[in-house]
């Protein structure tokens, strides 16, 4: 069977950009890299606990981190920024406090901004969250995939592939099912392909969701 390389790492520097923008001395590099991951985990956990429920989800497309001499700038790209701002009394301020507590260098200021994604269902992370929410609510997987493809097509993408693996609909034996619409040229480097893996926790076990979205060709 053919093994698939991660499409994001494969195209890094060609059509994909880094999500962390900073330079560091070799002795500090690993510490700052771990700090970046802790900040991302903190933001995702906050959204999962305080915002995500059966009727809506956080909708975070990506988190970009930029470091300067005395400033750390965290930019959250989300399809639904109103959820972060309005859902709780303090909202973004509470999230900023939680992230600040993780930082090891207390002398650096933290600036957090929200950027709205104009076409949220064209982002694989947001689409995967939607699918996971449906599967956790016991909606049939074929119906969920069909609806997700319809939502994605409205954003004028050129192609999409969705794959779900696990005990589908509670079956005894795990299997893999997939659906594709349009072109998804994984071997073409100039093709801008976004990719996401997302686990869904169902009563029958974990389902693995993979989404490839072909945005455009450079």
Curated annotation (Swiss-Prot):
Occurrences of domain KH type-2 (ranges): 47-118
PROSITE patterns hit by this protein: KH_TYPE_2, RIBOSOMAL_S3
Predominant subcellular localization, coarse grouping: plastid
GO cellular component: chloroplast; cytosolic small ribosomal subunit
InterPro entries tied to this protein: KH_dom-like_a/b (IPR015946), KH_dom_type_2 (IPR004044), KH_sf_prok-type (IPR009019), Ribosomal_S3_C_sf (IPR036419), Ribosomal_uS3_bac-typ (IPR005704), Ribosomal_uS3_C (IPR001351), Ribosomal_uS3_CS (IPR018280)
Signal peptide: none
PANTHER family noted in UniProt: 30S/40S RIBOSOMAL PROTEIN S3, SMALL RIBOSOMAL SUBUNIT PROTEIN US3C
Quaternary structure (record): Part of the 30S ribosomal subunit.
Protein name as catalogued: Small ribosomal subunit protein uS3c
Organism: Physcomitrium patens (Spreading-leaved earth moss)
Taxon lineage: Eukaryota, Viridiplantae, Streptophyta, Embryophyta, Bryophyta
Gene: rps3
């Amino acid at each position: 069977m053919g093994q698939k390389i991660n499409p994001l790492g494969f195209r890094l520097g060609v059509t994909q950009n880094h999500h962390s923008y900073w330079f560091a001395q070799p002795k500090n590099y690993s510490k700052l890299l771990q700090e970046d991951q802790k900040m991302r985990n903190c933001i995702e956990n906050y959204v999962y606990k305080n915002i995500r429920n059966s009727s809506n989800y956080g909708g975070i497309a990506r988190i970009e981190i930029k470091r300067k001499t005395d400033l750390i700038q965290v930019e959250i790209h989300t399809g639904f920024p109103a959820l972060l701002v309005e859902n709780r009394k303090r909202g973004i301020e509470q999230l900023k406090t939680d992230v600040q507590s993780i930082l090891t260098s207390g002398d650096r200021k933290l600036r957090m901004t929200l950027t709205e994604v104009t076409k949220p269902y064209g982002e694989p992370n947001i689409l995967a969250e939607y699918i996971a929410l449906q599967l956790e609510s016991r909606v049939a997987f074929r119906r969920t995939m069909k609806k997700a493809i319809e939502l994605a097509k409205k954003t004028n993408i050129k192609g999409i592939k969705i794959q779900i693996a696990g005990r589908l609909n509670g079956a005894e034996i795990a299997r893999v099912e997939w659906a594709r619409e349009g072109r998804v040229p994984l071997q073409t480097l100039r093709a801008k392909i976004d990719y996401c893996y997302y686990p869904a926790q169902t009563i029958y076990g974990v389902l693995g969701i993979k989404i490839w979205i072909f945005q455009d060709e450079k």
